[in-house]
Amino acid sequence: MAHDMDRSCDSRKYTYFFPTYLLIPPRPGSDLFYSLRRQNGEPPTHQFWDFLANGGDSDQELVTRIEELQHKRAWRIGVAELNALRATVGRFEGTHNFHNFTVDKDFRDRSNQRHMKIIQVTDPVVHGETEWISVLLHGQSFMLHQVFGF
């Protein structure tokens, strides 16, 4: 019988890297802002977006995408925001139903259960002009349906 690495392990680890500016709430007036408003009431606002009214080019209605991206790259996550992210991802540790990541399975099927051993968010690191964090996911029972994240 041949060794099958894909099925011979009892857990997997995946690490994802993303810029911290992805954690900034949506720009007021954006499609995402209005979508969240319809679903959840008023979405959170963030002082990051104050530059649109105060620090951007006052002759334009909107700051160009390049200026917005430069502003995002200069943004740094605060301790409270990082701790809130860690608390949020911590809720996914343990055993949970990952039905949405399976194929042709009923929601109540016990085979949808997956166990997240560890979800770890690193301290931010600046590369170039952008601040990055990594998220480590260490889970069991993810081989069959290849659940890579949430």
Regions of interest found by a model, annotated:
Residues 1-150:
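Structured-RNA-binding interfaces characteristic of tRNA pseudouridine synthases
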